[in-house]
Amino acid sequence: LWQPVADSLQEGDYVFIQIGHNDEAKEPQYAARYTSVPDYKINLIKFITETRAKKAIPILVTPVSRRKFDKEGNAQETHTEYTAAVFEVGKQYNVPVIDLDKKSRELYQVLGPKRVQYLAMALDTGEHPNYPNGQKDNTHFNEYGARRMAEIVLNDIKAQHLELADRIVKGMNAPTVNPQVK
């Protein structure tokens, strides 16, 4: 998946590097996806090096938080080692880091365990033309959830005063809840 991106890079392109959600899955059914933290860091460094070789600009993004809550309704940290690895590599290679892990978890906390489901691909039969039989997917986002994650990234680009911030026309909106949800 990376090579076509690397091959098409041009000077001045921005490359947002976000991996880790699947890499840390140790469950037997996901064994082929698992990447140890040291190998994960090697992959990040490879992407940074190849991006810079094309005079493009890398930006690291921590893995998006999993939608996991404890019994009291507190959003749980689920990517500790991998998020730390992103920050270590970012510091070592002087690459900005957007902490989507922390910021998405903060959004989940605001929404709570029930309302956070409105970000997910949880569709009833007939609800969406692309999924006529419905879809129950707690990992991937629906359009609204994806837009909320993009909003977090845009806001952090502005907050960090990255060069790219001058090209962002929107962002810095206060967190909102899906208007369709009552």
Residue locations for each model-derived region?
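Alpha-helical cap/lid subdomain in secreted, periplasmic
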Residues: 1-147, 151-169, 177-181
